[in-house]
């Protein structure tokens, strides 16, 4: 009898709508983490391009160079992966079909940004890193416009 009562009560309740980027209904989304990671990719790409190999055969100089180069590459790849993860969270968890009506190029923009993240992981290419920042800014602008706000993208570097 009690089960029937509970079931009849539950049947009359409309389902709760939740919005979340995680497995909890927090509803907290912000493209700031995407910008920080993408900006780190650009910064590390610039550092890698500027890094000069030693002109001598001194093993200590080469060890220092190799260590610095390896660290820069590791950070660049890690941040490209983080950028992609954050972009995909916005795409799969925040953006809804209604956003596609207003921003019909959203899927293409996200797809290109994700592809650029992969390209930036495997290449040391300033043009690709700058293009990634450009796409991150597009996503930033779409995100805030979808919330009825116009927040300027402020770079840390």
Q: Where are these predicted regions, by residue range?
A:
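N-terminal intrinsically disordered, cationic/polar leader segments
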Residues: 1-72, 104-138, 142-157
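Structured binding/interaction patches within domain cores
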Residues: 68-78, 82-89
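Short, well-ordered coil↔helix boundary/capping segments
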Residues: 77, 100-107
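Short, solvent-exposed, charged loop/turn and helix-capping segments
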Residues: 86-103
């Amino acid at each position: 009898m009690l089960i029937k009562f509970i079931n009849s009560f539950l049947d009359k309740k409309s389902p709760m709508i939740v919005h979340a980027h995680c497995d909890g209904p927090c509803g907290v989304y912000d493209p700031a983490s995407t910008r920080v990671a993408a900006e780190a990719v650009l910064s590390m790409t610039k550092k890698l391009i500027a890094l000069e190999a030693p002109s001598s055969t001194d093993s200590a100089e080469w060890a220092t160079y190799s260590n610095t180069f390896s660290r820069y590459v590791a950070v660049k790849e890690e941040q490209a992966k983080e950028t992609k993860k954050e972009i995909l969270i916005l795409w799969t968890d925040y953006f809804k079909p209604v956003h596609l009506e207003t921003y019909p190029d959203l899927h293409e923009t996200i797809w290109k940004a994700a592809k650029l993240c992969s390209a930036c992981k495997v290449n040391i290419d300033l043009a690709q890193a700058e293009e990634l920042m450009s796409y991150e800014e597009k996503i930033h602008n779409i995100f805030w416009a979808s919330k009825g706000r116009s927040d300027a993208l402020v770079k840390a570097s």
